[in-house]
Amino acid sequence: MHNESPIKRRKSTRIYVGNVPVGDGAPIAVQSMTNTRTTDVEATVKQIKSLERVGVDIVRVSIPTMDAAEAFKLIKQQANVPLVADIHFDYRIALKVAEYGVDCLRINPGNIGNEARIREVVAAARDKNIPIRIGVNGGSLEKDIQEKYGEPTPEALLESAMRHVDILNRLNFDQFKISVKASDVFLAVGAYRLLAQEIEQPLHLGITEAGGARAGSVKSAIGLGILLSEGIGDTLRISLAADPVEEVKVGFDILKALRIRSRGINFIACPTCSRQEFDVIGTVNALEQRLEDLLTPMDVSIIGCVVNGPGEAEVSTLGVTGARTKSGFYEDGIRQKVRLDNADMIDQLEAKIRAKASMLDENKRIGISQLDK
């Protein structure tokens, strides 16, 4: 029930990664990356399926060898989302996966080789209608740029990116997006701000090597939150030393917090104190796990007492306000006659949320069908 995001997004051109539109106002796509051995086809496909279940839009797969490229051919046949091939050092691997139907090629300017090699990659991409991501990283800048600046700086990342933008422009190839990632929040933010002023191509956001699940999520939320709040960014990846599924969840949570893209339940819950009348923390944790399959956007407030409970419930799709024995229940901001038994809160609230989601989905379906008439 909260208002739409006030953020005005940066104008950018449109490309397609498989069937996913990127840029020019398209929904910001959430990406992740497999961390299996790509030559282990079964494990890699299993992980991609796990990412698909939590709503990933695009998955990147590392292709370090020709054996991995051959495995990618089998992986691509079993994936339901677009796959990006992550290519370093050997440009010939990019040429091979282009033959196997890759949806996007990620190349690193710092190690892909000279312009002649890039020309071959671009020729293959053009022939197969495959977009390219220029993936600049503060940890692998070209040697001459490292010597010029002494250390990674926003200007150094920008120079690396623009050097390869110029090559693609000379080759009359405009189907590309760019990233300028760094592990330092301020370095990455500064580089993206500079790049956003220079080009109109879509930007892929990320804080690279952000860290473990907790610290990495915080760093990514700060860095990407700053950029997204300024309208910068068309795709994103949360880089965590953790299960890639967590990357997708955190990515959607950041977009949800900024009201840029809503997917699933936005839980509004109090941190609890001695005034709580039911187990708020246990209720929220259980419902987050049980309702992971729901994609319907809605705000659900779960507040343990009447201090802030009614106010939050009045601006939520569904809301619970703690009271002794039985708690108040709100729907669309209106208090209902029915009250929820505190002893059975989780099951009751799950049923209410699923019923509301079904109703909202049906209303949306009817609205779409009427527009089609």
Curated annotation (Swiss-Prot):
Catalyzed reactions: (2E)-4-hydroxy-3-methylbut-2-enyl diphosphate + oxidized [flavodoxin] + H2O + 2 H(+) = 2-C-methyl-D-erythritol 2,4-cyclic diphosphate + reduced [flavodoxin]
InterPro entries linked: Dihydropteroate_synth-like_sf, Enolase-like_C_sf, IspG_bac, IspG_bac-typ, NO2/SO3_Rdtase_4Fe4S_sf
Positions of [4Fe-4S] cluster binding: 270, 273, 305, 312
GO molecular function, a single term: 4-hydroxy-3-methylbut-2-enyl-diphosphate synthase activity (flavodoxin)
Pfam families: GcpE
Top-level division of the source organism's lineage: Bacteria
EC numbers, comma separated: 1.17.7.3
Co-factor note (free text): Binds 1 [4Fe-4S] cluster.
Enzyme class: oxidoreductase
Keyword Iron-sulfur: yes
GO biological process: isopentenyl diphosphate biosynthetic process, methylerythritol 4-phosphate pathway; terpenoid biosynthetic process
Keyword Metal-binding: yes
PANTHER family listed in its UniProt record: 4-HYDROXY-3-METHYLBUT-2-EN-1-YL DIPHOSPHATE SYNTHASE (PTHR30454), 4-HYDROXY-3-METHYLBUT-2-EN-1-YL DIPHOSPHATE SYNTHASE (FERREDOXIN), CHLOROPLASTIC (PTHR30454:SF0)
Family as reported in the entry's similarity comment: Belongs to the IspG family.
Function: Converts 2C-methyl-D-erythritol 2,4-cyclodiphosphate (ME-2,4cPP) into 1-hydroxy-2-methyl-2-(E)-butenyl 4-diphosphate.
Protein name: 4-hydroxy-3-methylbut-2-en-1-yl diphosphate synthase (flavodoxin)
Protein source organism: Photorhabdus laumondii subsp. laumondii (strain DSM 15139 / CIP 105565 / TT01) (Photorhabdus luminescens subsp. laumondii)
The gene coding this protein: ispG
